């Protein structure tokens, strides 16, 4: 079987979707499936083409970001059209796209309909995009109603990566959209060493962390405000490490730069981010509605962090309140602050939650199980 995947981003670009897509391809290719990935050449120093895992071919087309974290092909580039047209000379059994609002999903639609190939769309979002300004948010919502509608309606099958995503897809398309959770590459995560340099730098402090793209809907501003509400003596006992970049970075840096217990570390390689998660005590998941299932949340749980989470971005599907973490009912600064205080004052709870969450992730997020579910869908006609 030959599969063509249109992917909005792909490693070495950093993000949860990227690791999801790459690990999906790695484990799917082990079933003897030939995979071609068509993706933006971002970052610009990424190779134009490469082969991974023996039978995963990656083709990167010229692209730019019209706004942060929204890539578009360089339509004026002959190189883009040459690479895209070459795909039409090949025969694929299935076309896959990821996330309806990225331009690559439109490319998948065009290709699948012209070539009359079965098209499976994998959706990662659970709400309309919330951007830094009302104008951008309104434009994004309009785009969703037009192009998102086309993607969901014209695909042959929509797959949701979480139950939250499934509910969102149902707003556009009443066909069944099965939920298939991602797996985690436990072996590669285990090989990454804890960041002992960071641990030594903040010796005797409780390390609180966040990893992810810095969009408004990630709710990191609420986490910063919650940390700021801590009493002076508690602030001296903690450090909050924020790893990631995005359109909210300048704003978040501005509101936190006077606080020496909050560190904005910017974009870091995934291995570095995992190393920091491994020496973190608490992970703050502050998302508003929007994402499907946070990869960073799952990685924090496998790295033995005690999690304080809002129910969004799939957290209420993996966190059982007071069993393997703390689930707060809504995005509320005071509620988050109260739970941070609770864990700082009850360190035995940090240990209990972190141990239970690691077991739960191992049991429920297995790539072999996920790939078997996808394989059953691929067999259908």
Regions found by a protein language model. Give the residues of each.
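Conserved donor-binding/catalytic core segment of Leloir-type glycosyltransferases
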Residues: 4, 201-218, 224-228, 241
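Nucleotide-sugar donor phosphate/pyrophosphate-binding loop at the beta->alpha transition
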Residues: 118, 128-150, 167
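Short alpha-helical donor nucleotide-sugar binding micro-motif in glycosyltransferases
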Residues: 267-268, 275-280
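Short hydrophobic beta-strand element within catalytic cores of glycosyltransferases
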Residues: 306-309
């Amino acid at each position: 079987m030959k599969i063509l995947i249109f992917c909005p981003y792909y490693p070495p670009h950093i993000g949860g979707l990227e690791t999801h897509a790459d690990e999906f391809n790695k484990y799917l290719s082990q079933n003897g499936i030939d995979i071609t990935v068509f993706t933006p050449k971002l970052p610009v120093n990424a190779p134009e083409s490469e082969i991974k895992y023996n039978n995963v071919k990656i083709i990167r087309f010229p692209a730019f970001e019209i706004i942060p974290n929204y890539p578009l092909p360089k339509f004026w580039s002959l190189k883009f059209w040459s690479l895209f047209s070459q795909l039409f000379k090949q025969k694929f059994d299935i076309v896959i796209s990821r996330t309806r609002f990225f331009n690559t999903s439109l490319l998948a639609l065009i290709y699948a309909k012209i070539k009359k190939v079965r098209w499976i769309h994998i959706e990662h979002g659970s709400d309309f995009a919330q951007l830094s300004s009302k104008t951008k948010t309104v434009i994004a919502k309009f785009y969703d109603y037009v192009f998102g509608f086309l993607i969901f309606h014209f695909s042959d099958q929509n797959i949701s990566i979480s139950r939250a995503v499934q509910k969102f897809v149902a707003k556009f398309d009443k066909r069944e959209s099965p939920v298939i959770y991602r797996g985690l590459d436990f072996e590669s995560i285990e090989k990454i060493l804890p960041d002992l340099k960071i641990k030594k730098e903040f010796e005797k402090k409780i390390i609180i962390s966040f990893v992810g793209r810095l969009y408004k809907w990630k709710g990191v501003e609420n986490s910063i405000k919650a940390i700021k509400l801590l009493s002076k003596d508690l602030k001296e006992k903690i450090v909050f490490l924020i790893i990631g970049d995005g359109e909210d970075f300048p704003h978040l840096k501005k509101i936190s730069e006077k606080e020496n217990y909050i560190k904005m570390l910017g974009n870091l390689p995934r291995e570095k981010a995992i190393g920091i998660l491994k020496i973190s005590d608490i992970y703050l998941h502050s998302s508003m509605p929007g994402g499907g299932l946070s990869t960073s949340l799952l990685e924090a749980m496998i790295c033995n962090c005690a999690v304080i989470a809002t129910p969004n971005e799939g957290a209420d599907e993996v966190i059982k309140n007071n069993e393997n973490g703390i689930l707060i009912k809504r995005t509320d600064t005071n509620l988050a602050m109260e739970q941070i205080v609770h864990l700082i004052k009850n360190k035995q709870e940090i240990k209990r939650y972190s141990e239970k969450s690691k077991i739960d992730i191992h049991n429920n997020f297995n790539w072999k199980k996920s790939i078997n579910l996808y394989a059953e869908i691929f067999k259908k006609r």
